[in-house]
């Protein structure tokens, strides 16, 4: 779901992969509060947050002398990063993240959960951003250096800080993004691969993967049966729709041939080939997950520069860095007489470079605005007409068992 839920909301996919109604609800920007998918994601984030809070509470009781060097602070930093990661997911999906003055932020638990503290009010959006950034700043200042793609690090925390600033979206935030993104690109252990192909050919060993997840032998044994495994996710169950293919196809971008393919996936269909997400697909099912990769910093830079009113040439520069390494024709400033076309091009490059990896398409389409003031998402998904549609509903179970939880307002089409 981390890969494709938001692509459905963006109007880029068709077909079904989890249930007969869920994908249609995503497309309609209206998943009912009783739907099990909303609860499952909410619970997974809650488990991660509670695990981090339990560790943070326990480690404070351990004498500093029991740790070598700054290891205690590093462990705290790793836990605070993971808490921020989970709370950011809640913010992006269940809260009014676009409205700093909204009271509809997520549930920001900061201590271990017990029966006595189960009832808790949700935080406001402004407070939520402050708390998430506090955790990320701690991880930047005290976290460990890069160890592997499965672990938190200073540079990873700064990468997520860049995304959080874009989401919060004040003019001051946008002004900071280009330089902060450049620091992630140049000051840490990550490195852009020389080619788009190498990002995926090198898998977990790619210098560009900033954060992924580890699959145990038990999980790998189940990849051909698990509907949520990356290996099985596409496989004829869902596929790019016409709008996606207008933006990204074999004619207009060399990355397409490295992104999609058709193979004989016998566990799914032993007779006919099926469409797969080639860039992530692995025969053994150990498909890398890209919660964030370094190329996003270039895309974040382009988005922020456009917002800041930079020249067309300056906006195109980070996009062309990615086009150059993939063997595509470079974009030229003189071809853009309309600022709206520049906004659309940034979005198209996000789809071509990062499509179906981590929901980057949706959040960019929500953030970016046309000269009319309308969100770009209004062109991509005609169902959108009101910002209340941008947030999922709080799951019914949370509202039932947490008596202080206030649900999100429901959009009602007149």
Model-identified regions with their sequence ranges:
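Short coil/linker segments at helix-helix boundaries
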Residues: 70, 93-130
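Alpha-helix C-terminal capping/termination sites
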Residues: 89, 167-171, 300, 307-309, ...
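Conserved, well-structured interaction surfaces
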Residues: 19-94, 123, 140-147, 283-294, ...
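Inward-facing hydrophobic residues that define packing positions of alpha-helical scaffold repeats
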Residues: 52, 129, 136, 174, ...
């Amino acid at each position: 779901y981390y890969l494709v839920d938001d692509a459905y909301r963006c109007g880029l996919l068709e077909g079904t992969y989890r249930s007969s109604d869920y994908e249609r609800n995503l497309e309609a920007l209206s998943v009912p509060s009783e739907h099990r998918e909303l609860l499952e994601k909410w619970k997974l984030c809650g488990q991660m947050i509670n695990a981090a809070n339990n560790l943070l509470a326990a480690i404070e009781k351990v004498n500093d002398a029991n740790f070598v060097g700054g290891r205690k602070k590093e462990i705290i930093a790793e836990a605070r990063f993971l808490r921020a990661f989970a709370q950011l997911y809640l913010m992006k999906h269940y809260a009014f993240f676009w409205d700093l003055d909204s009271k509809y932020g997520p549930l920001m638990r900061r201590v271990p959960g017990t029966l006595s503290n189960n009832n808790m009010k949700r935080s406001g959006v402004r407070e939520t951003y402050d708390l998430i950034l506090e955790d990320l700043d701690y991880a930047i200042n005290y976290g460990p250096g890069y160890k592997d793609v499965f672990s938190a690090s200073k540079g990873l925390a700064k990468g997520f800080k860049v995304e959080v600033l874009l989401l919060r979206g004040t003019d001051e935030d946008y002004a900071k993004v280009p330089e902060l993104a450049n620091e992630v690109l140049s000051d840490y252990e990550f490195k852009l691969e020389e080619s788009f192909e190498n990002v995926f050919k090198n898998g977990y060993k790619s210098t560009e993967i900033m954060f992924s997840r580890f699959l145990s032998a038990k999980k790998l044994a189940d990849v051909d049966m698990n509907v949520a495994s990356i290996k099985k996710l596409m496989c004829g169950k869902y596929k790019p729709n016409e709008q996606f293919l207008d933006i990204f196809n074999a004619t207009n971008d060399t990355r397409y041939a490295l992104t999609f393919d058709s193979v004989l996936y016998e566990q799914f269909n032993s007779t006919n080939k099926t469409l797969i997400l080639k860039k992530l697909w692995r025969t053994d099912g150990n498909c890398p997950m890209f919660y964030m990769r370094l190329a996003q910093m270039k895309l974040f830079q382009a988005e922020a520069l456009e917002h800041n009113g930079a020249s067309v040439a300056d906006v195109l520069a980070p996009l062309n860095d990615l086009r150059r390494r993939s063997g595509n024709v470079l974009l030229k400033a003189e071809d853009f007489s309309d600022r709206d076309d520049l906004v659309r091009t940034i979005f198209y490059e996000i789809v071509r470079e990062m499509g179906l990896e981590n929901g980057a398409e949706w959040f960019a389409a929500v953030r970016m605005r046309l000269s009319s003031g309308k969100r770009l998402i209004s062109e991509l998904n005609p169902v959108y007409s009101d910002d209340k549609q941008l947030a999922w509903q709080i799951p019914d179970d949370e509202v039932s068992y947490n008596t202080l939880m206030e649900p999100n307002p429901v959009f009602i089409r007149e």
